[in-house]
Amino acid sequence: MADPQLITTAFDLPGYRIERSLGVARGIVVRSRSIVGTFGASIQTLFGGNISLYTSLCERARQDAYERMIEEARQMGGNAIVGMRYDATEIASGVTEVLCYGTAVQAVRAG
């Protein structure tokens, strides 16, 4: 499995040498809002500020997508991920796809 310290949005790993690029690893999660959550969030919008119900939903979706990406990188034989990114798309009303992706690599300590 990729070491959490060896996952970066950069395209290099200071102190490591990338020996092999294994391709794109990705984790995809599709989430929908519940009726109760949508109602609660609607109430929060009346008062302004952070809509904590949606923030929590987004954080869970991103974490799940991140963990799925790590698992795919591990299955590909990678121990690190470079160029990691998130993307989110509303694919239907109230249904959002969260994608976490990066390049799975085999990295070794330099030096």
UniProtKB/Swiss-Prot annotation:
UniProt cross-references to SUPFAM superfamilies, sorted A to Z: YbjQ-like
InterPro entries the UniProt entry points to: UPF0145_dom_sf, UPF0145_YbjQ-like
Biological source species: Burkholderia thailandensis (strain ATCC 700388 / DSM 13276 / CCUG 48851 / CIP 106301 / E264)
Name this polypeptide is given: UPF0145 protein BTH_I2656
A Pfam short name: YbjQ_1
Entry similarity comment: Belongs to the UPF0145 family.
Disulphide-bonded residues: none
PANTHER family named in the record: UPF0145 PROTEIN SCO3412, UPF0145 PROTEIN YBJQ
